[in-house]
Amino acid sequence: MTHQRHRREVVARLLRARRIGTQEELLEALRAGGIEATQATLSRDLAQLGARRVSRPEGGTVYELPAGAAERDGLATLRGLVSEVASNASLVVIRTHPGSAPAIARAIDLAGLPDVLGTIAGDDTIFVAPAGELRARKLATRLADLLGAPVAGEGPAQ
């Protein structure tokens, strides 16, 4: 993973986990995590991630990522490595090219999808546990769309 990509993933993770109102606060959080960056670099990263400052009802502003930005960024780069997504009432199974499952599972985990409780990856298969009952089919369809893969029994993805 490139330094730029890693830094952007950390920035996205920080923005999802904390209420950060200024680039200086974000730079301090990055430095605390051992990542050095300039304000100009951080500004470009925020623009690339689609982050924007929004007003809070209780006053002040915070940086916020658009819905789905992280998942599209991280998962879209893995298109072509997934051969099929299937589900039953309680589990989603993703079949990948040999050796690809760990990277795809990590991208799913980092995407912070609210419908995903967690993942377990082998060499070419990922088990995805939905966060709630009756969400497996919906989650399978969403992951298949993000990964450019067919859902079992529905034909190729568009």
UniProtKB/Swiss-Prot annotation:
<keyword id="KW-0238">DNA-binding</keyword>
<keyword id="KW-0028">Amino-acid biosynthesis</keyword>
<dbReference type="InterPro" id="IPR001669">
    <property type="entry name" value="Arg_repress"/>
</dbReference>
<dbReference type="GO" id="GO:0034618">
    <property type="term" value="F:arginine binding"/>
</dbReference>
<dbReference type="GO" id="GO:0051259">
    <property type="term" value="P:protein complex oligomerization"/>
</dbReference>
<keyword id="KW-0963">Cytoplasm</keyword>
<keyword id="KW-0805">Transcription regulation</keyword>
<keyword id="KW-0804">Transcription</keyword>
<dbReference type="InterPro" id="IPR036388">
    <property type="entry name" value="WH-like_DNA-bd_sf"/>
</dbReference>
<dbReference type="InterPro" id="IPR036251">
    <property type="entry name" value="Arg_repress_C_sf"/>
</dbReference>
<dbReference type="GO" id="GO:1900079">
    <property type="term" value="P:regulation of arginine biosynthetic process"/>
</dbReference>
<keyword id="KW-0055">Arginine biosynthesis</keyword>
<dbReference type="InterPro" id="IPR036390">
    <property type="entry name" value="WH_DNA-bd_sf"/>
</dbReference>
<dbReference type="InterPro" id="IPR020900">
    <property type="entry name" value="Arg_repress_DNA-bd"/>
</dbReference>
<dbReference type="GO" id="GO:0003700">
    <property type="term" value="F:DNA-binding transcription factor activity"/>
</dbReference>
<dbReference type="InterPro" id="IPR020899">
    <property type="entry name" value="Arg_repress_C"/>
</dbReference>
<comment type="similarity">
    <text>Belongs to the ArgR family.</text>
</comment>
<protein>
    <recommendedName>
        <fullName>Arginine repressor</fullName>
    </recommendedName>
</protein>
<dbReference type="Pfam" id="PF01316">
    <property type="entry name" value="Arg_repressor"/>
</dbReference>
<dbReference type="GO" id="GO:0006526">
    <property type="term" value="P:L-arginine biosynthetic process"/>
</dbReference>
<comment type="function">
    <text>Regulates arginine biosynthesis genes.</text>
</comment>
<keyword id="KW-0678">Repressor</keyword>
<dbReference type="GO" id="GO:0005737">
    <property type="term" value="C:cytoplasm"/>
</dbReference>
<comment type="pathway">
    <text>Amino-acid biosynthesis; L-arginine biosynthesis [regulation].</text>
</comment>
<dbReference type="GO" id="GO:0003677">
    <property type="term" value="F:DNA binding"/>
</dbReference>
<dbReference type="Pfam" id="PF02863">
    <property type="entry name" value="Arg_repressor_C"/>
</dbReference>
